[in-house]
Design a protein with these regions (language model features):
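Active-site-proximal specificity loops/subdomain of glycosyltransferases
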Residues: 42-92
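C-terminal non-catalytic accessory extensions
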Residues: 265-322
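Short beta-strand/loop segment that forms part of the nucleotide-sugar
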Residues: 31-41, 52-53
Length: 322
């Protein structure tokens, strides 16, 4: 079996539902997680290792790998450095066939059921989104992020020297590099990404997700994860590799079988009864969510513009001093 390690950095107060995340990691006992953190994680599963590091120590570690001065003022900016983790933390991943990174606002299902050795053998990169991405652990793959994209994307030096979030771990960065180099990316639609703009269980629609249904939920059942929805009079059940829920909290409180609802986690003892699930939504909700999403994108653009102006003014100030 090919060995997999997932590298993460987490600084500051832990999420309220961090034990939900840890429990789903524990069920994937044949995959290792390595977390650099300044928090106290208590007892963790055998396959989850915590290395105590401060944010400044990680910043110094990253800086030591590059000759130019990097910009890394907040932990959130680490998302742009994730494609370089195989290069930055190379001494920790030597014995593994694949390394990767993931988010903490998610729950894993049976990862190995989807990512078999046959699939890992055929592909250079697994998935395109930052929720969960894996890379073949070779010297060539681990330094591929350094390749200049020209007009096809953002150069890593530009990404690593600005406060602006460039989403280098997704479409405008590492994925474009892999595609330009004819590297094979596995991107089957086997996960669920929940909308951050709705209290209800609303699935974000893109190339990797399903259509929404009037009654739908996600079920965690002792390490297995399912997308369950009602279509006409039929209840359908599809196994998924993970669910990502940005902007939401799902504290399972140690339960081994539960569903996700708009009010949090709901314990399941027998079969799902839709009348007892507070999860129905109207399609008008989706339209409202689209407006919220547009507003969110506008705010991000304004924030990035302000960040760029501050950098330009700082450079002008330094030039004046000289």
């Amino acid at each position: 079996m090919k060995k997999i390690i997932i590298v993460c950095c987490y600084f500051g107060q832990k999420r309220k539902d961090y034990k939900t995340w840890l429990k789903s990691c524990e069920y994937n006992s044949n995959i290792d997680w390595l977390i650099f953190s300044d928090s106290d994680w208590g007892n963790t599963p055998p396959n989850v290792k915590i290395i105590k590091k401060t944010f400044n120590e990680i910043k110094e570690k990253i800086q030591s790998k590059f000759e130019f001065k990097i910009t890394l003022n907040t932990p959130y900016k680490l998302c742009d450095y994730k494609p370089a983790y195989g290069y930055i933390f190379e001494e920790y991943i030597e014995e593994y066939d694949f390394w990767g990174y993931c988010d903490f606002d998610m729950i894993f299902g049976d990862i190995r059921k989807f990512l078999t050795d046959e699939i890992l053998q055929q592909y250079d990169k697994i998935f395109k989104l930052g929720h969960l991405s894996l890379y073949k652990n070779t010297p060539g793959s681990n330094t591929l992020f350094k390749q200049d994209l020209g007009n096809y994307g953002t150069n890593y030096k530009e990404v690593f020297t600005t406060n602006e979030i460039k989403v280098f771990d997704e479409k405008q960065g590492i994925n474009s590099i892999y595609e330009l180099n004819n590297k094979k990316i596995y991107n089957e639609p086997c996960f669920i990404n929940l909308s951050k703009f709705s209290k209800q269980i609303v699935v974000v629609r893109n190339e990797n997700t399903k259509n929404n249904h009037s009654c739908q939920t996600v079920l965690f059942d002792q390490g297995k994860l399912y997308y369950i929805y009602k279509e006409k009079e039929n209840i359908n059940k599809e196994e998924i590799i993970y669910v990502h829920f940005s902007g939401k909290t799902f504290d399972s409180n140690g339960e081994e079988k539960y569903i996700l609802t708009q009010n949090g986690v709901q314990k399941v003892e027998k079969d799902i009864e839709w009348k007892k699930i507070d999860n129905n939504f109207l399609w008008i909700t989706l339209k409202i969510n689209k407006l919220k999403k547009i507003n969110f994108k506008i705010k991000r653009k304004i924030k990035n513009y302000i960040s760029r102006r501050e950098e330009i003014n700082e450079r002008k100030k330094q030039e004046t001093i000289k």
